[in-house]
């Protein structure tokens, strides 16, 4: 009975170590994903004002050429 308890305790201990290692890897993977998402958001923030300013400069000229009311 004592050896059975010892074996179960050993399995439990090894299982908890394995779970904690998997959890650390998962947390590291999630951090990497978050970094990519943050970079995408930064790129979107940089791209949107640029696109708006280009559209503000280009659209009036295009509208003028299409309607020929300059």
From Swiss-Prot:
Keyword Disulfide bond: yes
Location(s), subcellular: Secreted
Naturally occurring in which organism (per UniProt): Amolops loloensis (Lolokou Sucker Frog)
Name recorded for this polypeptide: Brevinin-ALb
Keywords: Amphibian defense peptide, Antibiotic, Antimicrobial, Cleavage on pair of basic residues, Cytolysis, Disulfide bond, Fungicide, Hemolysis, Immunity, Innate immunity, Secreted, Signal
Gene Ontology BP annotations: defense response to bacterium; defense response to fungus; innate immune response; killing of cells of another organism
Main location: secreted
Cysteines joined through disulfide linkages: 64-70
């Amino acid at each position: 009975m004592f050896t059975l308890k010892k074996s179960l305790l050993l399995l439990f201990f090894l299982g908890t170590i394995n779970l904690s290692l998997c959890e650390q890897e998962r947390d590291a993977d999630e951090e990497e994903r978050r970094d990519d998402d943050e970079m995408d958001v930064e790129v979107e923030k940089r791209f949107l004002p640029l696109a708006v300013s280009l559209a503000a400069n280009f659209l009036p000229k295009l509208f003028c050429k299409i309607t020929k009311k300059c």
